[in-house]
Amino acid sequence: MRKVLFFLAAFSIASAVHSQSLFEAAAQCIKRYEGLHAPEHYPYVGYGHRLLAGEAFRSDMNEKTADSLLRADLLRKCRVFRNFGKDSLLLGVLAYNIGETKVLKSRLAGKLRNGDRDIYSEYVSFRLIDGKVSAALEKRRREEFKLLFND
């Protein structure tokens, strides 16, 4: 019995550490692609946070504040997709860039809701800027998918 309890405790800890390391990897990936926004990118501050009505963040925030804001935003995005289980982080990262509504209404989310895990092409399809394929966005989507998708 003790061995079983020990195994369950170790498994729970390992799962939590794995989830934390995936979240950390996701945050670092976002930071790499977003970069720390300069004042001329207003209303975007930090690592791509769009200022909301009533928020008083300054456009010249330091890296520590920007990092904390990114993590808080990403956690909020992941909570929106908690019903998607292990895919909540993948969808949260995408929503960080394009918004929750677009992700929730997408064919990607529909396929996952229906149990279809063949979603690579749908995920990478979020690579357009003004209707044209962006090589940088395509690279970002491929990296996000490789990093966060677990089949």
Describe the role of every protein-language-model region.
Residues V4, L89, D116-I119:
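Short linear sequence motifs
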Residues V4-I13:
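Sec-dependent N-terminal signal peptides
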Residues H18-H37, H41, H49-F84, T101-D151:
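Long, amphipathic alpha-helical surface segments
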